[in-house]
């Protein structure tokens, strides 16, 4: 890339200040993402390790690539040694390629989670995700190695002003652009199109599925022991479920939480059309598990963790439960403890309802997280497409289609800006990341989840 006239002092200061802010914001934001995933219970799903690796790649761009690109841009020539130029170019391709291959892997993970939920979620373990991440980095390394092995034609070198540029041969430009950007983009578009079709087909079957397993929406289970189930709806359970529809926080059907028995997995939740017993004294909002009013100020920041501590669990009837006053229960029944009350379970109805509820909540979480990742992928493509398009166009018809230097540099830096945008996207579109960021910034962080 030939450089134009040097920038004025004012322009140099403005550009340096803006890029320095970009570097600091990228490091801070992506470090926050890594801490959030590693320390937040609501973000400890194995697939979120993809986001940790992606954030690490963005931090490496901000620390090893952008500062030297800034110096090269402002000085108009490569100030550093020739060996570092070759390493710098290879790392630039490596980190950019790893970012888009990460997104491609995330897209495939989303597709398998939506299309083969039961089969795939049982195999979606941290070890398996880490193996996929390692494969992603190996693919990126293979694509980035040619500049180190084959120097090729780097164009004329001005006297006294060394330049640091990639191989200028058309075959390499086209091959690297296809391997680093266009091919992964095509895969992601096809995968997300398939996910959209699956979701559309699922929505068409929605009215049949909303009534629960094997029953319509209007059907109510018969009371056990003379009216054990009241006629009221289950707002508390619905609110817990909606609060837990978070960023991919789904467990496989074969997994259990600590302290959870096989019997609990079948009786811990009910479809929303089933009924709840009114809980006396619970009409207005209180601190979770009878917390004192002083603790309510912290409740908003730790809502997810508190809900997990008191999430719906089927427990044997006893004189008092963990989260509510004692109630008189029919013999042989079980009670479902929730944040705002109790639900009495008749005999034999918990297993089917629990499986239905967990399956439906899992699908909802997958759909919401898929939307967030679609935004991440869309922003990435918007940021990098102008650069790769103009870069490839210059190789196809270098004399008549070459983009002006200033515009090409603008596209170049817009691509780098993408490294700072993912934390912003997570904050805007995902409440779990918002809560995790708030907790990290306002109090000491806790033990990592892995």
From Swiss-Prot:
Please list the disulfide bridges: 85-164
Q: Which disease shows up in the entry for this protein?
A: Epilepsy, familial adult myoclonic, 2: A form of familial myoclonic epilepsy, a neurologic disorder characterized by cortical hand tremors, myoclonic jerks and occasional generalized or focal seizures with a non-progressive or very slowly progressive disease course. Usually, myoclonic tremor is the presenting symptom, characterized by tremulous finger movements and myoclonic jerks of the limbs increased by action and posture. In a minority of patients, seizures are the presenting symptom. Some patients exhibit mild cognitive impairment. FAME2 inheritance is autosomal dominant.
Q: Name one Pfam family in it.
A: 7tm_1
Q: Where is this region: Disordered?
A: 204-229, 241-329
Q: Which residues lie on this side of the membrane: Extracellular?
A: 1-12, 70-86, 150-172, 390-405
Give the protein name, as stated in the record: Alpha-2B adrenergic receptor
Origin: domain of life: Eukaryota
GO terms of molecular function? alpha2-adrenergic receptor activity; epinephrine binding
Q: What is its main location?
A: membrane
């Amino acid at each position: 890339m030939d450089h134009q006239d040097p920038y004025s002092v004012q322009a140099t200061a403005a550009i340096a200040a803006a890029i320095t802010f970009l570097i600091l914001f990228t490091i801070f934001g992506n470090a926050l993402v890594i801490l959030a995933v590693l320390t937040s219970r609501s973000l400890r799903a194995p697939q979120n390790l993809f986001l940790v690796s992606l954030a690490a790649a963005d931090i490496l761009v901000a620390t090893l690539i952008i500062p030297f690109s800034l110096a090269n841009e402002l000085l108009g020539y490569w100030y550093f040694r020739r060996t570092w130029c070759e390493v710098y170019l290879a790392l630039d391709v490596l980190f950019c390629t790893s970012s888009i291959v990460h997104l491609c892997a995330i897209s495939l993970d989303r597709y398998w989670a939506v299309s083969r939920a039961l089969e795939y979620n049982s195999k979606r373990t941290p070890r398996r995700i880490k193996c996929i991440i390692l494969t992603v980095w190996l693919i990126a390394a293979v694509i980035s190695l040619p500049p180190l092995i084959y120097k090729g034609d780097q164009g004329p070198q001005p006297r006294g002003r060394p330049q640091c540029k990639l191989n200028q041969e058309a075959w390499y430009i086209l091959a690297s652009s296809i391997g680093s950007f266009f091919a992964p983009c095509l895969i992601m578009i096809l995968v997300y199109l398939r996910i959209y079709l699956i979701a559309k087909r699922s929505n068409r079957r929605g009215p049949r599925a909303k009534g629960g397993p094997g029953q319509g929406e209007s059907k109510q289970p018969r009371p056990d022991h003379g009216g054990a189930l009241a006629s009221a709806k289950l707002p508390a359970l619905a609110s817990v479920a909606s609060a837990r529809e978070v960023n991919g926080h789904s467990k496989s059907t074969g997994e259990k939480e600590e302290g959870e028995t096989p019997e609990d997995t079948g009786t811990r939740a009910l479809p929303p059309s089933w009924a709840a017993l009114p809980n006396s004294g619970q009409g207005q909002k209180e601190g979770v598990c009878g917390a004192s009013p002083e603790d309510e100020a912290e409740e908003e920041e730790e809502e997810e963790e508190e809900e997990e501590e008191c999430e719906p669990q089927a427990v044997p009837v006893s004189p008092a439960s963990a989260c509510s006053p004692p109630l008189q229960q029919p013999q042989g029944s079980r009670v479902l403890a929730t944040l705002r009350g109790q639900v009495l379970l008749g005999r034999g109805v918990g297993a089917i309802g629990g499986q239905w509820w967990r399956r439906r909540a899992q699908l909802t979480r997958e759909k919401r997280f898929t939307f967030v990742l679609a935004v991440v992928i869309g922003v990435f493509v918007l940021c990098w497409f102008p650069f790769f398009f103009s870069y490839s166009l210059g190789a196809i018809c270098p004399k008549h289609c070459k983009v002006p230097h200033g515009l090409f540099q603008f596209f170049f830096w817009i691509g780098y800006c993408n490294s700072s945008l993912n934390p912003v996207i997570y904050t805007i579109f995902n409440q779990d990341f918002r809560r995790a960021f708030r907790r990290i910034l306002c109090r000491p962080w806790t033990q990592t989840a892995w």
